[in-house]
Amino acid sequence: MNSVLTAASYILVHAPDMVVHNGTTQTTERVVNPGSEYLKQLPEHIRSYDQAVAYAPNQTYIGNMTPGQLGEMEQPWHDMPVAGATREGRYGEIMPQDEFLLLMQASDMFDLVRLDRAFVAKTKPALEKHPLLGQEILALVKAGEDASDIARAVNEEHAEGLYHMGQLVGYVKRAHDVDANLSAHVLLENLASKASAVLALRHLLHTSGVAPEEIEYVIECSEEACGDMNQRGGGNMAKAAAEVAGLGNATGSDVRGFCAAPSHAFVMAASLVKAGTFKKVAVTAGGSTAKLGMNAKDHVRKGLPVLEDVLGGFAVLITADDGKNPEIDLDIVGRHTVGTGASPQAVITSLVLSPLERAGMKIQDIDKFAAELQNPDITKPAGAGDVPQANFKMIGALAVKTGELDRGGLNGFIEQHGMVGWAPTQGHIPSGAPYMGFARQAILDGEMEKAMIIGKGSLFLGRLTNQFDGISFVLRKNRGAAQQQQEPGISKEEVRGMIAEALRSFAASMEG
């Protein structure tokens, strides 16, 4: 039997000061052009927390709106706030920056995150009201230290500053004098990713109703890497996040594949469960501070707010078949192989058409495709176009090429089988994963039967190969008893018969 998707959680962290101080577009600009007009104008384009919460794609990400409802809104969305928008959503929340800095400290096992005493005193009462973090996490927040000590660490000791509302409120210290892999900059990135994964895991426990000790394995699939100079990406971020999230009975490991990593991780998790190795596997990823404000130059130049101001995170729970939740069908897995090639048509053929043909299915047998769900509000002003729509056009074009669809039906195909994008451009975050929760619910509600989750990644960014990458799988309605009949087991009588026959054959061979 296949494994099933039992629950999903999605979280965002509003991080406006991290946009300014930690996003690589901004840190690079301060090196090459420190007096640029862009850096001067940037603060005027930063959104408030309330504005980020009321942003329709963000409300969609945490489950307060569906992709269909977002698609009914006229674009662009940045100047159309959602009335009555809330921090909490069906699948998670949008955490404010000040609370997240305390969560980063709680996620730090080596006393690297230091926070201002007054800032902690002001912020901790708000975090104590969080319904999902628990005293075991809150107890890890320290009382704080003097502002003068914080300023000295940043100005004289190579520490990386932590800011809120434009004010220095803490720092991340380096963990080694000469090891660049343990620099304050790298540790800040890793701790932010870890803390956002912790938040996603805590929400997953809530949405699933599963006890922390029931989760046996965690796969982390972000784009960060932790290690020292002797093993730069040694890991293990999965186990590190599981520790803080309270998953005391879990082990785990990391999966990397740029933007395709989540889909690789989902397939691996489903395989581990189907094989019986583990009963409950969580897949999670935190956000990327480096990508904050990645396209902000274009946004600022065009008079738009900086829309890449949130860290993204998610977690999904994959368990043994319960006869109810949607199956992850491992008989329909698309893969971009070494020999596939990198043309868009070759990529989509390998990920969509080929696995469906092997399963005796057609493209239009899939109700919804989820691929590269980047928010077009972000990508279109930056010149990258509408990325999800480009994917759905290519899939529709394949349907035309194979004779499934008339050319005149292409737009209708995109509307019926595609969707708008809503995910922040956090690399691994948009790549199919944000639709998992919505797909599960739509299948349970009888609104559809099959969705294909598509992960795509650009491996050339690591400068080790020019290869593209991708993997896909189908999430489908649970077939329950019907599947049992199609996959019968072997009865005890049949086993006894086979043993008896084997013994007779062995005896005959001995006589000869």
What do these predicted ranges mean?
Residues A275-V310:
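Flexible, glycine-rich active-site loops centered on histidine and acidic residues
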Residues S193-G252, R256-G257, K362-K393:
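Conserved beta-ketoacyl condensing-enzyme motif
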Residues Q167-A180, A184-L188, G227-M268, L272-K279, ...:
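Conserved catalytic cysteine-centered active-site region
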Residues C221-C226, G257-P262, A285-K291, G455-F460:
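Acidic, glycine-rich active-site loops and adjacent beta-strand->loop/helix elements
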Residues M229-R232, H264-V267, L292-D298, K380-G383, ...:
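Short acidic, glycine/serine/threonine-rich loops at helix termini
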Residues M1-L191, D298-I363, Q416, G455, ...:
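Condensing-enzyme catalytic core mediating Claisen C-C bond formation in acyl metabolism
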Residues S193-G209, A238, P344-G360, I395, ...:
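Short, well-ordered amphipathic alpha-helical segments that serve as non-catalytic structural scaffolds
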Residues T207-E216, G246-T251, A275-A285, R358-Q364, ...:
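Structural signature of cysteine-dependent C-C bond-forming condensing enzymes
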